Amino acid sequence: MVLIRVLANLLILQLSYAQKSSELVVGGLPCNINEHRFLVLVYSDGIQCGGTLINKEWMLTAAHCDGKKMKLQFGLHSKNVPNKDKQTRVPKKKYFFPCSKNFTKWDKDIMLIRLNHPVNNSTHIAPLSLPSKPPSQDTVCNIMGWGTISPTKEIYPDVPHCAYINIVDHAVCRAFYPGLLEKSKTLCAGILEGGKDTCQGDSGGPLICNGQIQGIVSVGGDPCAEPRVSVLYTKVFDHLDWIKSIIAGNTAATCPL
């Protein structure tokens, strides 16, 4: 069964494909407190997602993480013992890749959020660079999030977990996800033998390759971390012109809320 990486099992979203709860990093280890300064914890209408700060006023997450009431937490490591420089924001405006909320295609699961107030760079807060070029096959990339660390049980950690996975041939994902186009604006990434994966609660979080955000956690298998079932990540590089255009003030070709 195809799994959308969202936390609440009872949440019903109007998508054109089957879904379940969002996902956490399985097979990883607790992240170092200083290696995820860009990572955002998103609470959206009772569900948990991840996100990525790309400059002091803008962040990226998955479109399916959208909600009427969203709280965005920056500079967080331990949820139980927050860092002193933790900052909380809400969206000032949300932008979806032209009408992506319809979810008629796999490659539109991206949301650009303008914060109600800029965040201040600090010990635990700093943006992640946008991609200068797309990653090649077999590139080693990092995934991270507060999602569940068990592929079959909901065991959520206090601190984000990190793991390394690889960019894999897109044919691997096309074999598992019906209707996925060969030239889809997505990346296929994982470990072919299984054991490492994003899982429930990780939706919207980053796929980081060579120090840049290359993907956004979108869709995966259920249970998580199964062999030869890689995760689909929205390909940030293919949305780069749109992202830069929105930030520059050109909102004509989008569906803002």
From Swiss-Prot:
The keyword Hydrolase applies. It is found in: Secreted. Disulfide bonds join 31-162, 49-65, 141-209, 173-188, 199-224. Glycans are attached at residues 102, 120-121. Expressed by the venom gland. PANTHER family: KALLIKREIN-1, KALLIKREIN-RELATED. This is Snake venom serine protease KN8.
